Amino acid sequence: TGYPRNDVLFAKNNEKDITDIKKKLGISPEKKVIMYAPTWRVRNQFNMKIDIQELKKQIQDDYVLMLRIHPFAVKGLKEDLLDEFVINVSNYPSVEELYLASDIVITDYSSVMFDYAILNRPMLFFTYDLEDYRDTLRGFNFDFVAEAPGPLLKTSDEVIQSIVNIDKVAQEHDEALQKFRKKFCEYEKGTASEQIFQRVMQNQ
């Protein structure tokens, strides 16, 4: 049936609802939005590896950057990183609304990729510690390198340049994204809650 929590990604995927979400977040409707949502790495707190000042210099006229940090790692987020360009949404109650507000997601190995793929929007994978994560920390339960629905980027500069050239990057990785969606999002139709309700009622 898909996941009931993801039904909202269909129901609210429209200009009015997205504008309303941006207003709740304090983001201008005119701005495009990037969300950086890295996974928890077990042994460390959050450590910003993206050169925020360089990113800001390149894209601040057009974008806002939202940081969605894992609860176990958010203590490592330095308050002096935050300003009108960088906002902390780690405690925002609905990650689904954050997905809807985001034009691009930057992640790494997080399950964010499976839900955000439903929206068919670009994803960038900042995998600066790929070998360590795969071989030492947590590993993968699918062939991440072969099946990732976006580019695997090792450096901050690669991330920034991918954002600057996002239309080209998205086009180059669209085939991978569509394969990923077909494999992992097949049952996501926006009707999971209704399907489950109907099945429960049939069994009464």
Please place each PLM-identified region on the residue numbering.
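Short, acidic/turn-prone active-site loops that include or flank metal/cofactor-
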Residues: Y3-N6, N91-S94, Y128-D132
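Hydrophobic residues at beta-strand termini and immediately following loops
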Residues: T1, V89, L153
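Conserved catalytic-core segment of nucleotide-activated headgroup transferases in glycan assembly
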Residues: R5-E79, L153-T155, C185, A192-E194
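C-terminal alpha-helical cap of glycosyltransferases
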Residues: E188-Q204
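Donor nucleotide-activated moiety binding/catalytic core segment of transferases
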Residues: P71-F114
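Catalytic binding pocket for nucleotide-activated donors in carbohydrate/polymer assembly enzymes
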Residues: E84, S111-F184
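Short, well-ordered alpha-helix to beta-strand connector turns
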Residues: D62-Y63, F85, S102, N120
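Generic beta-sheet signal
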Residues: T1, R68, F126-Y128
